Regions:
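N-terminal Sec-pathway targeting helices
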Residues: 1-22
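Alpha-helical protein-protein interaction elements
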Residues: 13, 18-19, 59, 223, ...
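Ser/Thr/Asn(+Pro)-rich, low-complexity disordered segments
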Residues: 21-186, 208-219, 310-547
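Generic preference for well-ordered secondary structure
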Residues: 47, 118, 171, 175, ...
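Catalytic cores of extracellular degradative/oxidative enzymes
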Residues: 55-59, 64-65, 72-81, 90-91, ...
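Eukaryote-skewed repeat-based solenoidal scaffolds used as protein-protein interaction platforms
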Residues: 138-240, 244-274, 279
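Extended amphipathic alpha-helical segments with heptad-repeat/coiled-coil character used for oligomerization
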Residues: 248, 259-325
Length: 547
C-alpha cells in the first residue's frame, strides 16, 4: 500500500509540470502560427510617396501637449510599470517642458523586470513594454544634452534600456513555444536598437554586434515572416498599438533590411486600413485579446488614431477628434514614418467603387469590404474557435454621417447573439447576407417600402435595400435613378423570395449563391455567376478584388 502511495505521489510531482506546460501551451499560447504561404493577389501595396507632409499640425501639437502634462510615478521592482510614464517623459522632452524634473525622475528609476510574457516561471516579465517605449528617448534626445542630460543618458542606457546583447528569441521565457507577436517585436526591437546605438557610440564588444550575434538575422527573419504570411495579431485590440510602435521605432532608427521589412509591414497594414475604413470608422474582426464581448465603438481604434495624425499633417484643416488612443498616436506624432500617397487617398476619400478580400492566413478569417465615395460595407468575419483568439464583428454599413457606435449603423449578424456562432462572411460586391436580422438605426427614414424590402437613400443614385426576417438578413447596395427603380430592379431579378436563403441576382449583374450554414472556416459565398469561388479562409490572398 505504501509503495502505491509513493508511486502516486511521484507521478503527481512529475506530471504537474508537464500538465502546466501543456495547459499554458494550449490555452495561453499566443505566438505566431503559420500555414501555407499566402498569395499576394492582384492588388499591389502602394509605395509611391510624393505628398509633402507638414512638420506640425494642431492634432500633433495637442497630443504632445497632452502627454507633457502627465504625471510620472516611481517604479516598483517586479511590478509592471504604468506606461503613462514613458509617454509623459517623451511628451515633456518633445515639448521642452519640465526638463529638470524629468531628468531627475529618470535618474531615480531602474528596470523592474525582464522581457517576455509574465507567467509563473517569469514573474517579472513584461518589461519589454517599457524598453520599447523608452527607446525613442535615447534616439531622439541622446544628442540633445540640453534636454537629456549626459548623466541621465548614461543612466538610461545602463539601467533602463536593459534588453541588450545576444539572445534573440521568439519564445516565452522558460518554455519551448512562441511568445505573442507584440512581445517579440517589443523585446527584440529594443534589443536590436540598443545594440545598434552602443556600436555606433564606440562599444565594440561582440555581444552587441547585431550582424554576428544572431539578433539581426533573427529579427530580420521574424519580420520577413510577418510580411510574407501576414500579421498574426491582425487588428489586435489592444496589442496592435504595441506592435505598431515597435515597427515605427524600427522604421525610424534601424538600418538595412530590418528597417526595410518594418517599413513594408507598416505599408501593408496601412493599406488594409485604407481599404476597410471609412472616414476613420473602422470595425474589423481581430485576433487578440479574446473577450466574451466586443467594443461597440466604430471610431478611434488604435489604427485609426495613427492615420488621423498623418492626415492632419497632410491637411491641418480636417476636422479630426482623437477622443481616445492618444498613447498610441504619440508614436505617429513624433516619428518620421508617413504612409504612401494612395493609402492617404483611400483613407480620406474613396476615389471609386471597389470590392476587396484581404486574407490573414492561418486559422484566421478575412476582411472583406465593398465601398464607394459615399459608403463602405464591411464584413464581420468569423471566429475559428476560442483558441484562434479571433473576435469577429457584425457586418456594418458605414455612411457619411456622425455615427460613433454600432447601434447608430445599419448592421447584421447571425445566427443568434453569440458571436462565437456567427459566420459573417456572407459578402460580395455591394451585397451582404446573414442568418439573422438587419438592424436599422433609430431615426433612419425609408425612401420606399415594397414587397418586404425597405429602400434607404445613401446618396444621389445610390440606395440601400434591406430585407430582414428572423433568420435571413440581406443588405444590397443598388445604383438606380430612384428608390422605385432600385426596388423594381431587385424584383425583376429575383421573382421567388424563397430563394433568398440560397441565392440572389444582384441588379449589378452578379448572380450570387451562398450557404448561410457554412462552417466557420469557410466563406459563405459558394459561387458567383455560376463559377465556384475559393472558400477556404487560410488560402485567400493578401489583397484580391477590383479597385
Amino acid at each position: 500500500m505504501k509503495k502505491k502511495w509513493i508511486i502516486f505521489i511521484v507521478t503527481i510531482v512529475l506530471g504537474l509540470p508537464l500538465l502546466l506546460y501543456a495547459s499554458i501551451s494550449f490555452f495561453a499560447g499566443a505566438g505566431r502560427k503559420i500555414g501555407d504561404l499566402l498569395p499576394k493577389g492582384n492588388i499591389e501595396i502602394p509605395l509611391k510617396r510624393t505628398i509633402q507632409y507638414k512638420n506640425t499640425s494642431q492634432i500633433q501639437e495637442e497630443i504632445i501637449d497632452y502627454w507633457s502634462k502627465g504625471k510620472v510615478t516611481d517604479w516598483v521592482d517586479g511590478e509592471k510599470i504604468n506606461l503613462k510614464n514613458p509617454r509623459t517623459v517623451l511628451g515633456c522632452l518633445l515639448a521642452g517642458k519640465r526638463v529638470e524634473e524629468i531628468n531627475q525622475y529618470l535618474l531615480k528609476q531602474k528596470a523592474t523586470g525582464r522581457e517576455g510574457s509574465r507567467w509563473l516561471l517569469n514573474p517579472k516579465g513584461g518589461y519589454d513594454f517599457n524598453a520599447m517605449a523608452f527607446t525613442p528617448v535615447l534616439f531622439l534626445f541622446g544628442d540633445k544634452p540640453e534636454l537629456l542630460y549626459p548623466e541621465t543618458k548614461k543612466h538610461l542606457v545602463n539601467n533602463i534600456l536593459t534588453i541588450e546583447g545576444d539572445g534573440f528569441t521568439r519564445n516565452v521565457p522558460f518554455t519551448g513555444f512562441q511568445d505573442s507577436e507584440n512581445h517579440v517585436l517589443m523585446a527584440e526591437s529594443a534589443r536590436y536598437l540598443k545594440n545598434q546605438w552602443l556600436r555606433e557610440n564606440g562599444n565594440k564588444s561582440p555581444e552587441y554586434d547585431n550582424k554576428n550575434n544572431g539578433v539581426e538575422a533573427g529579427l530580420k527573419e521574424y519580420l520577413k515572416e510577418i510580411y510574407t504570411y501576414g500579421v498574426y495579431e491582425f487588428n489586435s485590440d489592444p496589442y496592435l498599438g504595441y506592435t505598431y510602435s515597435s515597427l515605427l521605432n524600427l522604421n525610424a532608427f534601424a538600418t538595412g533590411e530590418v528597417q526595410e521589412f518594418a517599413t513594408k509591414i507598416l505599408d501593408m497594414i496601412n493599406w488594409q486600413y485604407a481599404l476597410n475604413s471609412y472616414k476613420f470608422k473602422h470595425f474589423p474582426p481581430y485576433r487578440r485579446l479574446f473577450k466574451d464581448s466586443f467594443s461597440k465603438e466604430i471610431v478611434s481604434d488604435y489604427h485609426s488614431v495613427m492615420l488621423m495624425v498623418w492626415a492632419s499633417l497632410q491637411n491641418d484643416s480636417l476636422k479630426i477628434d482623437i477622443t481616445q488612443g492618444k498613447h498610441v498616436a504619440l508614436w505617429a506624432a513624433m516619428l518620421p514614418y508617413r504612409p504612401a500617397d494612395k493609402v492617404m487617398e483611400w483613407t480620406l476619400n474613396k476615389p471609386n467603387a471597389y470590392f476587396v478580400k484581404m486574407g490573414h492566413g492561418y486559422n484566421s478569417c478575412p476582411e472583406i469590404c465593398s465601398g464607394d465615395k459615399s459608403y463602405l460595407l464591411s464584413a464581420g468575419g468569423s471566429n475559428q474557435g476560442r483558441r484562434s483568439m479571433i473576435v469577429n464583428k457584425p457586418t456594418v454599413l458605414f455612411l457619411d454621417d456622425n455615427s460613433q457606435t454600432l447601434i447608430e449603423t445599419f448592421h447584421a449578424y447571425g445566427p443568434g447573439e453569440d458571436f462565437m456562432k456567427w459566420n459573417n462572411t456572407g459578402f460580395y460586391e455591394d451585397f451582404a447576407c446573414t442568418k439573422g436580422v438587419v438592424h436599422i438605426p433609430e431615426g433612419k427614414m425609408t425612401s420606399l417600402t415594397s414587397d418586404e424590402w425597405q429602400i434607404f437613400t445613401i446618396s444621389e443614385g445610390i440606395y440601400l435595400a434591406v430585407f430582414s426576417e428572423k433568420e435571413l438578413g440581406l443588405m444590397v447596395i443598388v445604383r438606380a435613378k430612384s428608390p422605385e427603380d432600385a426596388a423594381n430592379a431587385i424584383r425583376q431579378n429575383n421573382t421567388d423570395k424563397n430563394l433568398y436563403h440560397t441565392q440572389f441576382k444582384h441588379p449589378n449583374g452578379n448572380f450570387i449563391e451562398y450557404d448561410l450554414d457554412s462552417p466557420k472556416d469557410t466563406w459563405v459565398i459558394k459561387s458567383v455567376n455560376n463559377k465556384p469561388v475559393n472558400r477556404q479562409f487560410d488560402q485567400l490572398p493578401f489583397f484580391e478584388g477590383n479597385i
